Amino acid sequence: DINPLGIDIGSRGIPMFELDMNRVFPGDNNGAVAESVAAGIVSDIIGSDFCLDIHSSNIFVREMPQVRLNDDNVDKLLPYAKMLNADFVWIFSSITVLDATLAYSLNHLGVPTLVAEMGVGNRINKEYSLQLLDGIFYLMIQLGIWEDEPVKVREPIISTEGEVNFLTAKESGIFVPAINSCGIIHMGDNIGDIIEPIEGRILQHIESPMDGIVFTLRENPVVYKGALLARVHGGRK
């Protein structure tokens, strides 16, 4: 464990330094504690054949097992992303990528690195974990790291940023989902409602704007105006 104090308090920051560990890469050997740790991590990983940075989501939304990469590295990384048994691969603009993350720093330094994201923050989803584990072993077999009979991995949906619709709260209130999990949805299907908690009035009725797949869904019921409720990848509008 590279951050035992953070594990104790459920944070990826080092206590007392107020620094997010995934915002200080590639680090600085002469910097603050978090920066020095980050520099040590990068030094250990440099020279590796491949790196997979595994995340849960935050505590507010649930994510379908997915792999994320920016469009600068598509040619090099997309073949790896397809091996990881994810449901979804999201290719987004490099303009939106933070250059102080582990994945950005390692890719910049020549180590092929992908980010896998799934589930909800501070929670372990066994089904999602086993799904990704199959993908990791499949990738290692393809890279010659592991010898075994490869399992069959699923073919992920490949999406670019322009194909993703963000559904946000227009009012503050309590979000009550109408669907239990991420998955296939049709245009006009009910995703959920925002309820006024005192009177029980429906403040906002949220429907899918397209046929497609919900790959992000609000988990925390308390929402404020502008909060993310769902992300939908789709075709027909």
Model-derived regions, located:
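Structured catalytic-domain cores with a bias toward divalent-metal coordination
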Residues: 1-237
